[in-house]
Protein backbone atom coordinates (compact mmCIF):
# COMPACT_ATOMS: atom_id res chain seq x y z
CA UNK A 1 0.00 0.00 0.00
CA UNK A 2 1.19 3.51 -0.71
CA UNK A 3 2.29 5.69 2.18
CA UNK A 4 0.44 8.93 2.81
CA UNK A 5 2.33 11.50 0.75
CA UNK A 6 0.25 14.61 1.36
CA UNK A 7 0.66 16.83 4.38
CA UNK A 8 -2.50 18.10 6.00
CA UNK A 9 -1.89 21.51 4.41
CA UNK A 10 -1.56 19.96 0.97
CA UNK A 11 -4.73 17.96 1.51
CA UNK A 12 -6.61 21.10 2.47
CA UNK A 13 -5.35 22.87 -0.63
CA UNK A 14 -6.30 19.98 -2.88
CA UNK A 15 -9.79 19.76 -1.45
CA UNK A 16 -10.22 23.52 -1.53
CA UNK A 17 -10.80 24.26 2.13
CA UNK A 18 -11.07 27.88 3.23
CA UNK A 19 -11.42 27.12 6.88
CA UNK A 20 -8.82 28.17 9.39
CA UNK A 21 -6.65 25.44 10.77
CA UNK A 22 -8.73 24.18 13.70
CA UNK A 23 -8.34 20.86 15.38
CA UNK A 24 -11.72 19.26 16.18
CA UNK A 25 -10.39 16.28 18.07
CA UNK A 26 -13.26 16.08 20.53
CA UNK A 27 -15.88 16.07 17.78
CA UNK A 28 -14.13 14.04 15.17
CA UNK A 29 -11.88 11.47 16.78
CA UNK A 30 -13.60 10.30 19.94
CA UNK A 31 -15.64 7.09 19.67
CA UNK A 32 -19.37 7.40 19.08
CA UNK A 33 -21.64 7.12 22.08
CA UNK A 34 -21.84 3.60 23.45
CA UNK A 35 -18.96 2.29 21.37
CA UNK A 36 -15.88 0.77 22.93
CA UNK A 37 -12.63 0.46 21.03
CA UNK A 38 -12.58 -3.25 21.86
CA UNK A 39 -15.68 -3.65 19.66
CA UNK A 40 -13.79 -2.69 16.53
CA UNK A 41 -13.21 -5.28 13.86
CA UNK A 42 -9.68 -6.53 13.51
CA UNK A 43 -7.71 -4.92 10.72
CA UNK A 44 -7.78 -8.16 8.73
CA UNK A 45 -11.54 -8.63 9.16
CA UNK A 46 -12.23 -5.04 8.12
CA UNK A 47 -10.06 -5.38 5.01
CA UNK A 48 -11.51 -8.82 4.25
CA UNK A 49 -15.00 -7.32 4.24
CA UNK A 50 -13.80 -4.47 2.02
CA UNK A 51 -12.65 -7.06 -0.51
CA UNK A 52 -15.61 -9.46 -0.41
CA UNK A 53 -18.12 -6.59 -0.58
CA UNK A 54 -18.29 -3.24 -2.36
CA UNK A 55 -17.40 -1.59 0.94
CA UNK A 56 -18.68 -1.37 4.47
CA UNK A 57 -22.04 -0.31 5.76
CA UNK A 58 -23.58 -1.02 9.16
CA UNK A 59 -25.81 -3.85 7.94
CA UNK A 60 -22.82 -5.65 6.42
CA UNK A 61 -20.75 -5.35 9.59
CA UNK A 62 -23.66 -6.55 11.74
CA UNK A 63 -24.24 -9.55 9.49
CA UNK A 64 -20.55 -10.40 9.59
CA UNK A 65 -20.61 -10.30 13.40
CA UNK A 66 -23.66 -12.59 13.47
CA UNK A 67 -22.22 -15.20 11.13
CA UNK A 68 -18.45 -14.99 11.40
CA UNK A 69 -16.15 -15.06 8.42
CA UNK A 70 -16.83 -18.64 7.28
CA UNK A 71 -20.62 -18.50 7.31
CA UNK A 72 -20.65 -14.96 5.93
CA UNK A 73 -18.64 -16.23 2.96
CA UNK A 74 -21.01 -19.19 2.57
CA UNK A 75 -23.94 -16.79 2.42
CA UNK A 76 -22.25 -14.50 -0.07
CA UNK A 77 -21.25 -17.39 -2.35
CA UNK A 78 -24.84 -18.66 -2.31
CA UNK A 79 -26.08 -15.26 -3.48
CA UNK A 80 -29.71 -15.81 -2.50
CA UNK A 81 -30.46 -12.63 -0.54
CA UNK A 82 -31.01 -9.90 -3.10
CA UNK A 83 -33.84 -8.12 -1.29
CA UNK A 84 -33.44 -4.35 -1.58
CA UNK A 85 -34.73 -1.62 0.75
CA UNK A 86 -38.32 -0.77 -0.11
CA UNK A 87 -37.46 2.78 -1.21
CA UNK A 88 -34.82 1.44 -3.63
CA UNK A 89 -37.00 -1.36 -4.96
CA UNK A 90 -39.78 1.17 -5.57
CA UNK A 91 -37.42 3.26 -7.70
CA UNK A 92 -36.48 0.21 -9.75
CA UNK A 93 -40.06 -0.98 -10.13
CA UNK A 94 -41.04 2.43 -11.54
CA UNK A 95 -38.51 2.22 -14.39
CA UNK A 96 -39.79 1.67 -17.91
CA UNK A 97 -37.14 -1.00 -18.34
CA UNK A 98 -38.92 -3.13 -15.74
CA UNK A 99 -42.17 -3.41 -17.64
CA UNK A 100 -41.39 -2.91 -21.33
CA UNK A 101 -40.98 -6.15 -23.32
CA UNK A 102 -37.47 -6.02 -24.76
CA UNK A 103 -38.44 -7.99 -27.87
CA UNK A 104 -41.01 -5.39 -28.82
CA UNK A 105 -38.49 -2.60 -28.22
CA UNK A 106 -36.08 -4.13 -30.70
CA UNK A 107 -38.74 -4.98 -33.28
CA UNK A 108 -39.98 -1.39 -33.09
CA UNK A 109 -36.43 -0.04 -33.38
CA UNK A 110 -35.70 -2.11 -36.49
CA UNK A 111 -38.96 -0.97 -38.09
CA UNK A 112 -38.33 2.68 -37.18
CA UNK A 113 -34.79 2.66 -38.54
CA UNK A 114 -36.08 1.24 -41.81
CA UNK A 115 -38.75 3.94 -41.96
CA UNK A 116 -36.19 6.65 -41.19
CA UNK A 117 -33.84 5.37 -43.87
CA UNK A 118 -36.61 5.76 -46.46
CA UNK A 119 -37.36 9.38 -45.52
CA UNK A 120 -36.53 11.90 -48.24
CA UNK A 121 -36.42 15.02 -46.06
CA UNK A 122 -32.94 15.34 -44.42
CA UNK A 123 -34.25 17.40 -41.49
CA UNK A 124 -37.03 14.93 -40.77
CA UNK A 125 -34.51 12.10 -40.96
CA UNK A 126 -32.18 13.90 -38.54
CA UNK A 127 -34.96 14.63 -36.04
CA UNK A 128 -36.30 11.09 -36.23
CA UNK A 129 -32.87 9.61 -35.57
CA UNK A 130 -32.37 11.96 -32.64
CA UNK A 131 -35.69 10.87 -31.13
CA UNK A 132 -34.82 7.19 -31.46
CA UNK A 133 -31.35 7.75 -30.04
CA UNK A 134 -32.76 9.58 -27.03
CA UNK A 135 -35.20 6.74 -26.40
CA UNK A 136 -32.42 4.17 -26.58
CA UNK A 137 -30.22 6.24 -24.28
CA UNK A 138 -33.07 6.41 -21.77
CA UNK A 139 -33.23 2.63 -21.60
CA UNK A 140 -29.43 2.33 -21.36
CA UNK A 141 -29.40 4.88 -18.51
CA UNK A 142 -32.15 3.01 -16.69
CA UNK A 143 -30.11 -0.19 -16.98
CA UNK A 144 -27.15 1.66 -15.47
CA UNK A 145 -29.28 3.17 -12.73
CA UNK A 146 -30.70 -0.21 -11.78
CA UNK A 147 -27.26 -1.82 -11.59
CA UNK A 148 -25.80 0.97 -9.46
CA UNK A 149 -28.70 0.84 -7.00
CA UNK A 150 -28.24 -2.90 -6.69
CA UNK A 151 -24.49 -2.53 -6.19
CA UNK A 152 -24.96 0.03 -3.42
CA UNK A 153 -27.84 -1.60 -1.54
CA UNK A 154 -28.04 -5.34 -2.22
CA UNK A 155 -27.08 -7.61 0.70
CA UNK A 156 -25.59 -9.96 -1.94
CA UNK A 157 -22.48 -7.85 -2.26
CA UNK A 158 -20.25 -10.56 -3.70
CA UNK A 159 -22.85 -11.40 -6.33
CA UNK A 160 -23.04 -7.73 -7.31
CA UNK A 161 -19.28 -7.62 -7.73
CA UNK A 162 -19.43 -10.74 -9.87
CA UNK A 163 -22.21 -9.26 -12.02
CA UNK A 164 -19.90 -6.30 -12.69
CA UNK A 165 -16.93 -8.61 -13.27
CA UNK A 166 -18.76 -10.76 -15.83
CA UNK A 167 -20.41 -7.76 -17.46
CA UNK A 168 -16.91 -6.43 -18.03
CA UNK A 169 -15.57 -9.83 -19.13
CA UNK A 170 -18.42 -10.38 -21.60
CA UNK A 171 -18.47 -6.72 -22.55
CA UNK A 172 -21.07 -5.15 -24.83
CA UNK A 173 -21.10 -1.51 -25.95
CA UNK A 174 -24.49 0.17 -25.59
CA UNK A 175 -24.00 2.63 -28.44
CA UNK A 176 -23.63 -0.01 -31.14
CA UNK A 177 -26.81 -0.64 -33.11
CA UNK A 178 -29.76 -1.31 -30.85
CA UNK A 179 -27.67 -2.70 -27.96
CA UNK A 180 -28.79 0.28 -25.86
CA UNK A 181 -32.30 -1.18 -25.83
CA UNK A 182 -30.94 -4.57 -24.77
CA UNK A 183 -28.39 -3.64 -22.08
CA UNK A 184 -30.68 -4.15 -19.10
CA UNK A 185 -32.05 -7.43 -20.40
CA UNK A 186 -28.50 -8.62 -21.08
CA UNK A 187 -27.58 -8.16 -17.42
CA UNK A 188 -30.75 -9.73 -16.07
CA UNK A 189 -30.97 -12.72 -18.41
CA UNK A 190 -27.42 -13.49 -19.49
CA UNK A 191 -25.21 -12.33 -16.60
CA UNK A 192 -26.98 -12.09 -13.25
CA UNK A 193 -28.51 -15.62 -13.10
CA UNK A 194 -25.10 -17.23 -13.71
CA UNK A 195 -22.75 -14.84 -11.90
CA UNK A 196 -21.97 -17.41 -9.18
CA UNK A 197 -23.03 -20.48 -11.14
CA UNK A 198 -21.55 -22.60 -13.90
CA UNK A 199 -19.18 -21.01 -16.39
CA UNK A 200 -20.43 -23.07 -19.34
CA UNK A 201 -23.99 -21.90 -18.66
CA UNK A 202 -22.75 -18.32 -18.49
CA UNK A 203 -20.95 -18.59 -21.83
CA UNK A 204 -24.01 -20.08 -23.51
CA UNK A 205 -26.30 -17.42 -22.02
CA UNK A 206 -24.14 -14.61 -23.40
CA UNK A 207 -23.76 -16.45 -26.72
CA UNK A 208 -27.53 -16.60 -27.16
CA UNK A 209 -28.28 -13.05 -26.09
CA UNK A 210 -29.09 -10.57 -28.87
CA UNK A 211 -26.94 -7.86 -27.24
CA UNK A 212 -23.82 -9.97 -27.77
CA UNK A 213 -24.92 -11.16 -31.21
CA UNK A 214 -25.54 -7.56 -32.31
CA UNK A 215 -22.38 -6.18 -30.70
CA UNK A 216 -19.96 -8.74 -32.14
CA UNK A 217 -21.80 -9.16 -35.45
CA UNK A 218 -22.70 -12.84 -35.25
CA UNK A 219 -26.23 -11.91 -36.29
CA UNK A 220 -24.64 -11.34 -39.71
CA UNK A 221 -22.73 -14.64 -39.71
CA UNK A 222 -24.17 -17.00 -42.33
CA UNK A 223 -22.91 -19.92 -44.38
CA UNK A 224 -22.52 -17.79 -47.48
CA UNK A 225 -21.20 -14.73 -45.61
CA UNK A 226 -18.85 -15.72 -42.78
CA UNK A 227 -18.16 -13.17 -40.04
CA UNK A 228 -15.37 -14.20 -37.66
CA UNK A 229 -15.69 -11.37 -35.12
CA UNK A 230 -17.57 -13.21 -32.40
CA UNK A 231 -15.72 -16.50 -32.91
CA UNK A 232 -12.41 -14.74 -32.39
CA UNK A 233 -13.50 -12.92 -29.22
CA UNK A 234 -15.24 -16.00 -27.85
CA UNK A 235 -11.87 -17.73 -27.88
CA UNK A 236 -9.50 -14.85 -27.16
CA UNK A 237 -11.47 -12.82 -24.61
CA UNK A 238 -14.22 -15.05 -23.23
CA UNK A 239 -12.72 -18.53 -22.78
CA UNK A 240 -9.08 -19.23 -23.69
CA UNK A 241 -7.17 -15.97 -23.68
CA UNK A 242 -4.37 -14.83 -25.96
CA UNK A 243 -1.58 -17.25 -26.91
CA UNK A 244 -3.58 -20.26 -25.73
CA UNK A 245 -2.44 -22.60 -28.48
CA UNK A 246 -5.24 -22.14 -30.99
CA UNK A 247 -4.75 -21.08 -34.60
CA UNK A 248 -6.49 -18.87 -37.12
CA UNK A 249 -7.90 -22.09 -38.57
CA UNK A 250 -9.60 -22.80 -35.22
CA UNK A 251 -11.16 -19.32 -35.31
CA UNK A 252 -12.43 -19.96 -38.84
CA UNK A 253 -13.84 -23.36 -37.90
CA UNK A 254 -15.63 -21.87 -34.88
CA UNK A 255 -17.05 -19.09 -37.06
CA UNK A 256 -18.56 -21.73 -39.37
CA UNK A 257 -20.00 -23.58 -36.38
CA UNK A 258 -21.63 -20.32 -35.22
CA UNK A 259 -23.36 -19.63 -38.55
CA UNK A 260 -27.10 -19.24 -38.17
CA UNK A 261 -26.84 -18.11 -34.53
CA UNK A 262 -28.60 -14.77 -34.72
CA UNK A 263 -31.55 -12.53 -33.92
CA UNK A 264 -35.20 -12.85 -34.86
CA UNK A 265 -36.98 -9.54 -35.47
CA UNK A 266 -39.70 -11.01 -37.71
CA UNK A 267 -42.91 -12.66 -36.64
CA UNK A 268 -43.04 -15.27 -39.37
CA UNK A 269 -40.66 -18.26 -39.21
CA UNK A 270 -38.22 -18.90 -42.07
CA UNK A 271 -39.19 -21.38 -44.77
CA UNK A 272 -37.29 -24.57 -44.06
CA UNK A 273 -36.88 -27.91 -45.76
CA UNK A 274 -38.90 -30.57 -43.92
CA UNK A 275 -35.73 -32.33 -42.66
CA UNK A 276 -34.56 -29.15 -40.91
CA UNK A 277 -37.78 -27.80 -39.46
CA UNK A 278 -37.09 -29.39 -36.08
CA UNK A 279 -33.70 -27.67 -35.94
CA UNK A 280 -35.15 -24.14 -35.85
CA UNK A 281 -34.72 -22.58 -32.39
CA UNK A 282 -36.42 -19.41 -31.18
CA UNK A 283 -36.21 -18.07 -27.64
CA UNK A 284 -37.35 -14.47 -27.38
CA UNK A 285 -35.18 -12.57 -29.84
CA UNK A 286 -32.64 -15.38 -30.14
CA UNK A 287 -32.84 -17.51 -33.25
CA UNK A 288 -30.91 -20.44 -34.65
CA UNK A 289 -31.82 -20.46 -38.33
CA UNK A 290 -30.84 -23.69 -40.13
CA UNK A 291 -31.05 -21.90 -43.50
CA UNK A 292 -28.07 -19.75 -42.48
CA UNK A 293 -26.02 -22.56 -40.91
CA UNK A 294 -23.07 -24.50 -42.34
CA UNK A 295 -23.86 -28.16 -41.62
CA UNK A 296 -20.40 -29.43 -42.56
CA UNK A 297 -18.25 -31.27 -40.05
CA UNK A 298 -15.58 -29.10 -38.43
CA UNK A 299 -12.42 -29.63 -36.40
CA UNK A 300 -11.98 -27.34 -33.39
CA UNK A 301 -8.83 -27.61 -31.26
CA UNK A 302 -8.25 -31.08 -32.68
CA UNK A 303 -11.76 -32.36 -31.93
CA UNK A 304 -14.25 -33.21 -34.68
CA UNK A 305 -17.67 -31.59 -34.35
CA UNK A 306 -20.27 -33.24 -36.56
CA UNK A 307 -22.79 -31.12 -38.43
CA UNK A 308 -26.11 -31.17 -36.64
CA UNK A 309 -27.54 -27.73 -35.90
CA UNK A 310 -27.35 -25.85 -32.61
CA UNK A 311 -25.99 -28.99 -30.92
CA UNK A 312 -22.75 -28.18 -32.75
CA UNK A 313 -22.59 -24.83 -30.96
CA UNK A 314 -23.12 -26.45 -27.57
CA UNK A 315 -20.45 -29.04 -28.40
CA UNK A 316 -18.03 -26.27 -29.39
CA UNK A 317 -18.64 -24.43 -26.11
CA UNK A 318 -17.99 -27.67 -24.23
CA UNK A 319 -14.68 -28.06 -26.06
CA UNK A 320 -13.64 -24.50 -25.19
CA UNK A 321 -14.55 -24.48 -21.51
CA UNK A 322 -12.94 -27.86 -20.83
CA UNK A 323 -9.54 -26.72 -22.08
CA UNK A 324 -6.91 -26.32 -19.34
CA UNK A 325 -6.15 -22.93 -20.90
CA UNK A 326 -9.71 -21.82 -20.15
CA UNK A 327 -9.44 -22.81 -16.50
CA UNK A 328 -6.19 -20.91 -16.12
CA UNK A 329 -7.41 -17.87 -18.06
CA UNK A 330 -10.52 -17.44 -15.90
CA UNK A 331 -8.58 -18.13 -12.69
CA UNK A 332 -5.97 -15.54 -13.65
CA UNK A 333 -8.59 -12.93 -14.43
CA UNK A 334 -10.55 -13.52 -11.22
CA UNK A 335 -7.37 -13.35 -9.16
CA UNK A 336 -6.34 -10.13 -10.91
CA UNK A 337 -9.73 -8.60 -10.08
CA UNK A 338 -9.82 -9.69 -6.44
CA UNK A 339 -6.23 -10.20 -5.30
CA UNK A 340 -3.41 -8.44 -7.16
CA UNK A 341 -2.43 -6.97 -10.50
CA UNK A 342 0.04 -9.83 -10.76
CA UNK A 343 -1.51 -12.62 -8.68
CA UNK A 344 0.73 -15.35 -7.25
CA UNK A 345 1.05 -18.28 -9.70
CA UNK A 346 0.42 -20.70 -6.82
CA UNK A 347 -3.02 -19.17 -6.26
CA UNK A 348 -3.89 -19.15 -9.96
CA UNK A 349 -2.85 -22.80 -10.20
CA UNK A 350 -5.07 -23.76 -7.26
CA UNK A 351 -8.04 -21.85 -8.67
CA UNK A 352 -7.54 -23.42 -12.11
CA UNK A 353 -7.51 -26.90 -10.57
CA UNK A 354 -10.79 -26.15 -8.80
CA UNK A 355 -12.27 -24.85 -12.06
CA UNK A 356 -11.41 -28.10 -13.84
CA UNK A 357 -12.36 -30.38 -10.97
CA UNK A 358 -15.76 -28.69 -10.54
CA UNK A 359 -16.52 -28.33 -14.27
CA UNK A 360 -16.43 -24.56 -14.04
CA UNK A 361 -18.26 -23.95 -10.75
CA UNK A 362 -17.62 -20.23 -10.26
CA UNK A 363 -18.50 -20.19 -6.55
CA UNK A 364 -16.12 -23.08 -5.91
CA UNK A 365 -13.29 -21.26 -7.67
CA UNK A 366 -13.99 -18.14 -5.63
CA UNK A 367 -13.99 -20.14 -2.40
CA UNK A 368 -10.55 -21.52 -3.24
CA UNK A 369 -9.37 -17.95 -3.71
CA UNK A 370 -11.01 -16.42 -0.63
CA UNK A 371 -9.74 -19.17 1.69
CA UNK A 372 -6.16 -19.03 0.43
CA UNK A 373 -3.11 -17.68 2.25
CA UNK A 374 -2.33 -15.60 -0.82
CA UNK A 375 -5.68 -13.82 -0.57
CA UNK A 376 -5.16 -13.08 3.12
CA UNK A 377 -1.70 -11.68 2.43
CA UNK A 378 -3.09 -9.32 -0.22
CA UNK A 379 -5.65 -7.54 1.95
CA UNK A 380 -5.52 -3.77 1.70
CA UNK A 381 -3.25 -3.82 -1.34
CA UNK A 382 -5.65 -4.03 -4.30
CA UNK A 383 -6.40 -0.65 -5.87
CA UNK A 384 -10.06 0.20 -6.38
CA UNK A 385 -11.23 0.81 -9.92
CA UNK A 386 -13.71 3.72 -10.26
CA UNK A 387 -16.75 1.47 -9.76
CA UNK A 388 -15.40 0.14 -6.48
CA UNK A 389 -14.29 3.57 -5.31
CA UNK A 390 -17.56 5.36 -6.00
CA UNK A 391 -19.86 2.63 -4.70
CA UNK A 392 -17.81 2.14 -1.53
CA UNK A 393 -17.81 5.89 -0.87
CA UNK A 394 -21.60 6.13 -1.16
CA UNK A 395 -22.09 3.01 0.97
CA UNK A 396 -19.89 4.36 3.75
CA UNK A 397 -21.16 7.94 3.64
CA UNK A 398 -24.88 7.21 3.62
CA UNK A 399 -24.88 3.81 5.30
CA UNK A 400 -28.09 2.36 3.88
CA UNK A 401 -30.00 5.62 3.50
CA UNK A 402 -31.78 5.46 0.12
CA UNK A 403 -30.46 7.97 -2.40
CA UNK A 404 -32.97 9.41 -4.85
CA UNK A 405 -30.71 10.46 -7.72
CA UNK A 406 -28.11 8.25 -9.40
CA UNK A 407 -27.04 10.89 -11.96
CA UNK A 408 -24.11 12.11 -9.80
CA UNK A 409 -22.82 8.54 -9.45
CA UNK A 410 -23.11 8.01 -13.21
CA UNK A 411 -21.28 11.28 -13.82
CA UNK A 412 -18.48 10.28 -11.43
CA UNK A 413 -18.00 7.01 -13.29
CA UNK A 414 -18.11 8.77 -16.65
CA UNK A 415 -15.58 11.33 -15.45
CA UNK A 416 -13.20 8.58 -14.39
CA UNK A 417 -13.58 6.74 -17.69
CA UNK A 418 -15.54 3.70 -16.52
CA UNK A 419 -19.21 4.11 -17.52
CA UNK A 420 -21.36 1.00 -17.45
CA UNK A 421 -21.97 -0.33 -20.98
CA UNK A 422 -19.53 2.31 -22.19
CA UNK A 423 -16.40 0.42 -23.24
CA UNK A 424 -16.13 0.49 -27.02
CA UNK A 425 -13.96 -2.58 -27.56
CA UNK A 426 -14.79 -6.12 -26.37
CA UNK A 427 -11.80 -6.44 -24.03
CA UNK A 428 -13.56 -4.53 -21.23
CA UNK A 429 -12.00 -2.17 -18.70
CA UNK A 430 -8.56 -2.78 -17.23
CA UNK A 431 -8.41 -4.16 -13.70
CA UNK A 432 -4.92 -3.00 -12.76
CA UNK A 433 -3.81 0.01 -10.72
CA UNK A 434 -1.91 1.65 -13.57
CA UNK A 435 -5.16 2.16 -15.48
CA UNK A 436 -6.78 4.20 -12.70
CA UNK A 437 -4.06 5.84 -10.60
CA UNK A 438 -2.86 8.71 -12.78
CA UNK A 439 -2.65 12.24 -11.38
CA UNK A 440 -5.79 13.13 -13.31
CA UNK A 441 -7.65 10.19 -11.81
CA UNK A 442 -6.50 11.14 -8.32
CA UNK A 443 -7.72 14.71 -8.82
CA UNK A 444 -11.13 13.39 -9.82
CA UNK A 445 -11.26 11.27 -6.68
CA UNK A 446 -10.52 14.34 -4.58
CA UNK A 447 -13.44 16.10 -6.24
CA UNK A 448 -15.75 13.15 -5.61
CA UNK A 449 -14.60 12.95 -1.99
CA UNK A 450 -15.31 16.65 -1.54
CA UNK A 451 -18.74 16.44 -3.19
CA UNK A 452 -19.81 13.52 -1.01
CA UNK A 453 -18.18 14.95 2.10
CA UNK A 454 -19.90 18.32 1.70
CA UNK A 455 -23.27 16.74 1.03
CA UNK A 456 -23.84 18.86 -2.09
CA UNK A 457 -23.60 16.10 -4.70
CA UNK A 458 -27.35 16.05 -5.38
CA UNK A 459 -27.87 12.41 -4.46
CA UNK A 460 -31.12 13.24 -2.68
CA UNK A 461 -32.65 15.44 -5.38
CA UNK A 462 -35.41 13.12 -6.60
CA UNK A 463 -34.70 12.43 -10.27
CA UNK A 464 -38.22 11.09 -10.83
CA UNK A 465 -39.87 14.39 -9.95
CA UNK A 466 -41.35 13.36 -6.62
CA UNK A 467 -40.61 14.88 -3.21
CA UNK A 468 -37.04 14.71 -2.00
CA UNK A 469 -36.34 12.33 0.90
CA UNK A 470 -35.96 14.01 4.31
CA UNK A 471 -32.15 14.13 4.20
CA UNK A 472 -30.41 17.46 4.47
CA UNK A 473 -26.89 18.63 5.07
CA UNK A 474 -23.74 16.57 4.83
CA UNK A 475 -23.13 12.97 5.91
CA UNK A 476 -21.51 12.23 9.25
CA UNK A 477 -18.75 9.73 8.60
CA UNK A 478 -17.28 9.82 12.11
CA UNK A 479 -19.86 7.32 13.31
CA UNK A 480 -19.77 3.92 14.97
CA UNK A 481 -19.29 2.38 11.52
CA UNK A 482 -16.11 4.38 11.03
CA UNK A 483 -14.62 3.41 14.38
CA UNK A 484 -15.75 -0.19 14.02
CA UNK A 485 -14.72 -0.93 10.45
CA UNK A 486 -12.59 1.81 8.89
CA UNK A 487 -10.30 3.22 11.55
CA UNK A 488 -8.66 -0.20 12.17
CA UNK A 489 -6.90 -0.11 8.80
CA UNK A 490 -5.96 3.59 8.62
CA UNK A 491 -2.29 4.52 8.90
CA UNK A 492 -0.94 6.82 11.60
CA UNK A 493 -0.31 9.46 8.93
CA UNK A 494 -3.93 9.39 7.81
CA UNK A 495 -5.22 9.49 11.39
CA UNK A 496 -2.97 12.47 12.07
CA UNK A 497 -4.18 14.22 8.93
CA UNK A 498 -7.80 13.72 9.97
CA UNK A 499 -7.18 15.57 13.24
CA UNK A 500 -6.15 18.60 11.18
CA UNK A 501 -9.52 18.87 9.42
CA UNK A 502 -11.11 22.27 9.94
CA UNK A 503 -14.71 21.05 9.76
CA UNK A 504 -16.73 17.82 9.68
CA UNK A 505 -17.17 18.25 5.92
CA UNK A 506 -13.44 18.53 5.43
CA UNK A 507 -12.88 15.52 7.69
CA UNK A 508 -15.24 13.53 5.44
CA UNK A 509 -13.33 14.59 2.35
CA UNK A 510 -9.97 13.78 3.94
CA UNK A 511 -11.16 10.29 4.81
CA UNK A 512 -12.64 9.52 1.37
CA UNK A 513 -9.56 10.95 -0.34
CA UNK A 514 -7.11 9.06 1.86
CA UNK A 515 -4.76 6.53 0.26
CA UNK A 516 -6.22 3.67 2.31
CA UNK A 517 -9.72 4.33 1.02
CA UNK A 518 -8.52 3.87 -2.56
CA UNK A 519 -7.44 0.32 -1.71
CA UNK A 520 -9.36 -2.74 -0.65
Q: Where do the language-model regions lie?
A:
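Active-site substrate-binding loop specific to GH73 endo-beta-N-acetylglucosaminidase modules
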Residues: 123-126, 143-144, 179-400, 405-409
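Flexible, low-complexity segments enriched for small/polar residues
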Residues: 37-60, 94-96, 323, 327-358, ...
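A general structural motif at alpha-helix termini
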Residues: 65-68, 77, 206, 369-373, ...
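Bacterial N-terminal signal peptides
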Residues: 21-31
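Short alpha-helix boundary/capping elements
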Residues: 53-57, 81, 170, 174, ...
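Bacterial N-terminal signal peptides that target proteins for export
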Residues: 4-23
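N-terminal accessory alpha/beta regions
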Residues: 58-169, 173-184, 190
